[in-house]
């Protein structure tokens, strides 16, 4: 199934400031950016010329990047952008997500249709990460790599109408002490009843959906 480009982020509270999905294409720069100091949001895609997408390094106030069907070179390049606060990655096959672990100021993370990797532990380096949206992570079924992510307040895990995201168990919730919103979409629960007992450890939980 191709990506829906709908906006499924919970816009209540301060969990998300990332632009809606459908707006990503408006931020692709296939031209020379004149006012680089004013640029805060950009989208990078494999369809861009190198001299165009590399302008990300010349925008000192850049806060948000969408990697839409990117090349491996583009993905590795953003490791240098340690000041960005928001990252969306869509349509990419990665052996690991170590490149995300270098983005120490990241607050919001969206991974959509990102396959090939299984280990989520690089995210533990992100001590400011407050919101995560996972959608269609083909090789991931164990979410224990999130344990210890104390800054996390919002977590959404989803599949699609034609593929349910497997979740081995929910023990990882015990390691998310500040989680306020826990949201599930199309998933397969691989644990027998009562699978959701770990949710009782979430003392700050405000919403389940």
Please report, for each region that a protein language model flagged, where it lies by residue.
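Concave beta-strand-loop units of leucine-rich repeat
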Residues: 2-98, 102-209
């Amino acid at each position: 199934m191709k990506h829906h480009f709908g906006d499924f982020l919970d816009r209540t509270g301060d969990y998300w400031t990332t632009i809606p999905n459908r707006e990503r294409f408006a931020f692709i720069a296939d031209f020379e950016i004149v006012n680089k100091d004013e640029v805060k949001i950009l989208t990078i895609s494999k369809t861009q010329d190198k001299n165009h997408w590399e302008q990300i390094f010349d925008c000192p106030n850049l806060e948000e990047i969408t990697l839409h069907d990117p090349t491996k070179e583009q993905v590795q390049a953003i490791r240098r952008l340690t000041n960005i606060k928001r990252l969306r990655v869509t349509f990419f096959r990665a052996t690991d997500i170590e490149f995300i672990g270098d983005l120490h100021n990241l607050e919001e993370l969206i991974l959509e249709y990102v396959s090939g990797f299984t280990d989520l532990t690089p995210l533990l380096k992100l001590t400011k990460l407050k919101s995560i949206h996972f959608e269609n992570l083909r090789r991931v079924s164990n979410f224990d790599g999130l344990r210890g992510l104390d800054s996390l307040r919002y977590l959404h895990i989803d599949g699609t109408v034609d593929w349910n995201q497997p979740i081995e168990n929910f023990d990882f919730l015990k390691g998310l002490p500040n989680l306020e919103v826990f949201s599930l979409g199309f998933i397969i629960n691989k644990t027998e009843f009562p699978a959701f007992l770990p949710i009782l450890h979430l003392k700050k939980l405000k919403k389940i959906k």
